[in-house]
Amino acid sequence: MSTEPVSQHDPLALAGLMQLVSPALPIGAFAWSQGLESALELGWVDDEASLGEWLAGVLDDGLTRCELPVLARVHRAWAEGDAQALAHWNDWLQANRETRELLEEEQRLGGTLVRLLRSLDQVPVTPAMPETPGYVVVFALAARVRGVSREDAMLGFAWAWLENQLTVACKALPLGQTSAQRLVERLRPALVAAVSEALALDDDDLGPALPGLALASALHETQYSRLFRS
């Protein structure tokens, strides 16, 4: 009897998701730290243990309550061609970006991804596209066009976030690649759990609770020396 795991994924859709979450995707995500650079400068994060606590907190009180459930909703809205829902959740998410840098990151990554997808003939002509689409909304569209399921798109988005944050930390901290991979192993189950929890949330349960990240991001706007744009 074979003990080999059986794939439940469309290989082409999986390859499309891997393309979307790749650090090589030319949208400039590497330039943004989402407040982590400021947390490093302030000494809130200074080693592997404190970085793990920071990332776990942002995942639990941020992505799980904000980006991931919104991604689930806009993935469905794209499938249904629901322009009203797309506009609502695009506006809601951008209104919850608590600093100029975080809002700029959302809008710039969204705009860059739209331009890339258009150059690849991957954006259908649709009046449902918001006027200033954010990254989450465009990521959901790209996943939908590639046949990526809602749950897989959410997990891929969370994975890309984690990988980017660890890249930031490795550049700005004396943090080695092995330490980064230990954090990946620690947080991989948390990413899966975050997707499940996000799917169970009602609309009224949504909203980030990250005052520390908001403060770090605000302070980053006037930080003297910076490697990253947020």
UniProtKB/Swiss-Prot annotation:
Indicate whether Cytoplasm appears among the record's keywords.
yes
Q: Which GO terms describe its molecular function?
A: nickel cation binding
Q: One GO CC annotation, please?
A: cytoplasm
- The reply to whether Cell membrane figures as a keyword in the UniProt entry is no
- Where is it chiefly localized? cytoplasm
Q: Which InterPro entries match?
A: UreF, UreF_sf
Question: Where's it found, cell-wise?
Answer: Cytoplasm
- UniProt keywords, alphabetically: Chaperone, Cytoplasm, Nickel insertion
What's the superkingdom here?
Answer: Bacteria
Protein family per UniProt: Belongs to the UreF family.
What exactly does this protein do? Answer: Required for maturation of urease via the functional incorporation of the urease nickel metallocenter.
| Assembly notes | UreD, UreF and UreG form a complex that acts as a GTP-hydrolysis-dependent molecular chaperone, activating the urease apoprotein by helping to assemble the nickel containing metallocenter of UreC. The UreE protein probably delivers the nickel.
Protein name per UniProt: Urease accessory protein UreF
Question: Which source organism does the UniProt entry give?
Answer: Chromohalobacter salexigens (strain ATCC BAA-138 / DSM 3043 / CIP 106854 / NCIMB 13768 / 1H11)
- UniProt lists the gene as ureF
